[in-house]
Amino acid sequence: MALKIRLARGGSKKRPYYQIVVADARSPRDGRFLEKLGSWNPMLAKDDEKRIELNAERVQHWIDQGAQPTDRVLRFLDQAGLAKRPARSNPVKALPGKKAQERAAEAKQKAEEAAAAASEAAAE
């Protein structure tokens, strides 16, 4: 049985509230779970101490049992110091698009030509 530590949504429409639970990976998002490990209330301020509540001892127990945290839960565990989240590095994503790169190359070429023309005019 593949176990996941994941979020189960609660609350009402436009007012989300999530429970951090251990569940079988095949069960529905809000379906049956084995144990509640904590909660996350995204409606609270980011610096509020009750925004994320975790039972660290039980989280560590389930990780030792082989439960895999989802991406969002892994962020919470990393903030709490319970698990290490690998750094994601995608330098290609930060590059400008093809057209923007072409425009930048053209602007650089025009600037070089203008600088060369200015130096020739100053030399005469």
Curated annotation (Swiss-Prot):
Family annotation (Gene3D superfamilies): 3.30.1320.10
Keywords: Ribonucleoprotein, Ribosomal protein
Keyword Kinase: no
Coiled-coil stretches: none
Biased composition (Low complexity): 114-124
Composition skew (Basic and acidic residues), residue ranges: 99-113
Chain segments carrying region Disordered: 85-124
Signal peptide location: none
InterPro entries hit by this protein: Ribosomal_bS16, Ribosomal_bS16_dom_sf
GO molecular function list: structural constituent of ribosome
Keyword Ribosomal protein appears in the UniProt entry: yes
One GO BP annotation of this record: translation
Cellular component annotations (GO), alphabetically ordered: cytoplasm; small ribosomal subunit
Similarity comment: Belongs to the bacterial ribosomal protein bS16 family.
Record's protein name: Small ribosomal subunit protein bS16
Organism annotation: Sinorhizobium medicae (strain WSM419) (Ensifer medicae)
Encoding gene per record: rpsP
